[in-house]
Amino acid sequence: MRSGVIAQKLGMTRIFTDAGEHLPVTVLKVESCQVVAHRTLDKNGYVAVQLGAGKRKPKNTNKAERGQFARAEVEPKRKLAEFRVDADALIPVGAEITADHFVVGQYVDVTGTTIGKGFAGGMKRHNFGGLRASHGVSISHRSIGSTGGRQDPGKTFKNKKMPGHMGDVTVTTQNLKVVMTDVERGLIAVEGAVPGHAGGWIMVRDAVKKRLPSEAPKPGAFKLRETAGAVAAEATNEEGA
């Protein structure tokens, strides 16, 4: 099981196929998605990688967060998330995951927070039919009607579908096909809609219900950071030449 990535939703557009058909796609941007920490079986009881994405000013991070980012030698991140992985699929701390982590044609599962709709009635929130347009009904055409039973049980059961807050919940959409990747610009285009508004954070993982293509990189596609020693060695080699 490989790591996923933290991406940012840019919006929707369409891509034309060679046959002239157009596909509605959602464009996701993978930018500065780096490994911040590891979770190991000995220390934490499970194996995972903690990723960070986006940029945040140091003054807007607390002392504990600054220490965590300093140990990983990465810039402060706006979004953090963990992804469970196999023990042999750990990506080095500080490595930056790139858009070619996913290959064209593979399926992914995306997780995001849906757009909040505020307080909504039963017809909009749960697709209720409402009451009759006439024949004794006045004013309450869009109400949900009775919510309880008779004298027994004499109550409304918990989890009854009723008017209330709609949206702003975490939702996972499964089996979206990767249509295009652009490593230079850090873009991933997936077929279909992705939950959330433009600019929202999206967790992208390999689909659990589809087979991973053999050409998918393992443990992933990433760029290792340049250490001070490597930079100094390159400078020495250039001077010697």
Curated annotation (Swiss-Prot):
Source species of the chain: Azorhizobium caulinodans (strain ATCC 43989 / DSM 5975 / JCM 20966 / LMG 6465 / NBRC 14845 / NCIMB 13405 / ORS 571)
Role of this protein: One of the primary rRNA binding proteins, it binds directly near the 3'-end of the 23S rRNA, where it nucleates assembly of the 50S subunit.
Gene assigned in the entry: rplC
Post-translational changes noted in the entry: Methylated by PrmB.
InterPro entries xref list: Ribosomal_uL3, Ribosomal_uL3_bac/org-type, Ribosomal_uL3_CS, Transl_B-barrel_sf
The UniProt record lists the keyword Cytoplasm: no
Keywords assigned by UniProt, alphabetized: Methylation, Ribonucleoprotein, Ribosomal protein, RNA-binding, rRNA-binding
Positions of region (Disordered): 140-168
Subunit organization: Part of the 50S ribosomal subunit. Forms a cluster with proteins L14 and L19.
Post-translational modification N5-methylglutamine, affected residues: 151
Full protein name: Large ribosomal subunit protein uL3
GO cellular component term, pick one: cytosolic large ribosomal subunit
Keyword field contains RNA-binding: yes
Molecular function terms, GO-annotated: rRNA binding; structural constituent of ribosome
PROSITE patterns the record matches: RIBOSOMAL_L3 (PS00474)
Gene3D superfamilies assigned: 3.30.160.810, Translation factors (2.40.30.10)
